[in-house]
C-alpha cells in the first residue's frame, strides 16, 4: 500500500450574503361585474383580512381601479394569484388578480 506524503488540505472560504427574495404586490383589479361581497370573501379567504380590512380594500378597488392585497415573495404571490383567479372563474366572475414587482 502506498503512503501519501505531506498532503495539504486547502479550505477555501466562500463568503456569500443571502439576499432577501424579490417581493411582489398582489393586486385585485376592478371590473364592472364581480359583486362587492365576492371581493370581500376573496380578501378574507385568501389574504386573511378581517371584515373591515376586506371592505376597505374592496372600496379602494372599486374607487381607484385596483387594491393591494399584500406583498409576498414571488412563489407565494404567484400561488395566491393563481388561487384567486381560479376561484373567481369557478364562481363565474371576471375578477382579475395580478402581481407587480415591488
From Swiss-Prot:
Pfam family, one: ClpS
InterPro entries attached to this UniProt entry: ClpS, ClpS_core, Ribosomal_bL12_C/ClpS-like
Gene Ontology BP, a term: proteolysis
Subunit relationships: Binds to the N-terminal domain of the chaperone ClpA.
Entries under NCBIfam families matching the protein: PRK00033.1-3 (NF000670), PRK00033.1-5 (NF000672)
HAMAP family assigned to the protein according to its UniProt record, in alphabetical order: ClpS
Biological function: Involved in the modulation of the specificity of the ClpAP-mediated ATP-dependent protein degradation.
Family note: Belongs to the ClpS family.
Protein name, per record: ATP-dependent Clp protease adapter protein ClpS
Species in which this protein is naturally found: Shewanella frigidimarina (strain NCIMB 400)
Lineage: Bacteria, Pseudomonadati, Pseudomonadota, Gammaproteobacteria, Alteromonadales
